[in-house]
């Protein structure tokens, strides 16, 4: 029940922002729903030697993405009961985008739980990708393990999101970037992401960044967060250095962390994580599991 109410609320925020801008004098507009429609998605692999830039532009609703060994770049389904949500596919050279259709409204949309918009997409595991996810207020579940990601860039609004790398990323990832608003975000298996640099920026909310997995190379991580609780998990035995800056925040450590002023470290062997954390207020938790 709570999740349903949360999704309705964030859909309003996202679509007002995307379609109308902020205007408190706008009238309330009923969102017209109809029978549920399901579109089959099948996007061929572009004929190019370049890394494919794949963009998923999603306004509000629910999205699920997972890897799949297949002959096409993307397969899956999109289900919706608002005709304006019909997805649009654009492809040119190495650029591919799937985007939610624009909702045509003249005021503030009045949503209830009958409004549906669900994406379920499978991504090709063997094609090198720069994956860009641009979303509004939504619920998302991304299983990205086993893909060939060279860059990952996620930007979303008020969101409830789980990202997981349950298997190693098959490519070297130059940069992993996640920028979110007031959200609840969990990133698991980051050791499998095979990244060189990671940037995580957030507003108020609750965030968990777990670097479990098979860390293949040194990684540099920058975390900037507002009034929030940020949990960073580094498995015991992985060398790590965390530098913290946050005048109105405090740090709680659990496990094998050693403190020296605003610096926290853990001994280990193999590739090292260097993490810089800046917080406006709240709590930083450092854990081993």
Q: Regions from the language model: what does each represent?
A:
Residues 156-158, 180:
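Periodic small-residue-enriched repeat registers in elongated scaffold domains
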Residues 39-45, 76-80, 84, 95-112, ...:
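Short, surface-exposed interaction patches in beta-rich subdomains
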Residues 21-23:
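Bacterial signal peptide processing site
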Residues 16-19:
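C-terminal motif of bacterial Sec signal peptides marking the signal peptidase cleavage site
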């Amino acid at each position: 029940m709570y999740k349903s109410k949360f999704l309705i609320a964030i859909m309003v925020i996202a679509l007002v922002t995307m379609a109308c801008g902020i205007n408190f004098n706008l009238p309330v507009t009923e969102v017209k729903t109809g029978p549920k429609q399901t579109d089959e998605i099948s996007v061929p692999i572009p004929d190019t030697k370049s890394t494919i830039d794949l963009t998923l532009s999603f306004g509000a609703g629910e999205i699920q993405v997972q890897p799949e060994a297949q002959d096409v770049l993307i397969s899956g389904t999109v289900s919706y009961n608002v005709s304006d949500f019909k997805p649009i596919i654009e492809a040119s050279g190495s650029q591919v985008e799937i985007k939610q259709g624009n909702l045509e409204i003249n005021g503030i949309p009045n949503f209830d739980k009958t409004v549906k918009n669900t994406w379920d997409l499978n991504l090709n595991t063997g094609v090198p990708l720069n994956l860009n996810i641009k979303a509004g207020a939504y619920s998302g579940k991304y299983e990205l393990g086993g893909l060939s990601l060279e860059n990952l860039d996620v930007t979303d609004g008020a969101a409830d999101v789980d990202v997981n790398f349950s298997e190693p990323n098959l490519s070297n990832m130059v940069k992993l970037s996640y920028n979110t608003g007031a959200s609840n975000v969990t990133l698991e298996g980051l050791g499998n992401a095979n990244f060189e640099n990671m940037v995580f920026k957030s507003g108020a909310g609750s965030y968990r960044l777990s670097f479990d997995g098979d860390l293949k190379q040194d990684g540099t991580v920058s975390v900037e967060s507002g009034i929030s609780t940020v949990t960073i998990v580094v498995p015991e035995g992985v060398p790590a250095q965390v530098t913290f800056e946050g005048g109105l925040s405090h740090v709680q450590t659990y496990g094998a962390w050693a403190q020296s002023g605003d610096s926290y470290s853990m001994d280990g062997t193999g590739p090292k994580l260097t993490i810089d954390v800046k917080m406006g207020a709240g709590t930083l938790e450092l854990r081993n599991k």
